[in-house]
């Protein structure tokens, strides 16, 4: 992992925090690299992974998701409740992370971006939240 890659990770984290997101994948900022940054706001801090992959998944959860790439849209998405993710951290160390609940959801959402998928492909009850008091049903 070189300085240029670390700078990209720093920029991605800054973008994620400025937009009040909990995750960001490199393709969302027009970079064709397999990098994600994640912070589930539980106090454990930023997680940055290069070449992340889900090596184990179990259970099921359905919950609401939105995305910085599809502003204003929200929908319910079924995801695994527990995942094991392997990747390389910014210090060039191989890491394995076991996540469940919200953090597991974020990992799956961001890794989907690396595979060219958006949450709206999996969402039910997709809706557009506007500045108006009513919600607009899409699907």
Where do the protein language model's features map onto the residues?
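Positively charged
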Residues: 1-139
């Amino acid at each position: 992992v070189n300085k240029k890659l670390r700078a990209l990770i720093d920029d991605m984290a800054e973008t994620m925090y400025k937009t009040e997101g909990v995750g960001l994948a490199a393709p969302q900022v027009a970079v064709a690299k397999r990098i994600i940054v994640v912070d589930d706001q539980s106090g454990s801090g930023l997680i940055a992974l290069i070449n992340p992959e889900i090596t184990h998944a179990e259970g099921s959860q359905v919950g609401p998701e939105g995305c910085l790439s599809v502003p204003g849209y929200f929908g319910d998405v079924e995801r695994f409740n527990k995942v094991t993710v392997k990747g390389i951290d910014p210090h060039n160390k191989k890491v394995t992370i076991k996540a469940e609940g919200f953090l597991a959801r974020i990992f799956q959402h961001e890794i989907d971006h690396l595979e060219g998928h958006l949450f709206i492909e999996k969402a039910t009850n997709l809706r557009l939240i506007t500045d108006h008091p009513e919600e607009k049903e899409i699907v």
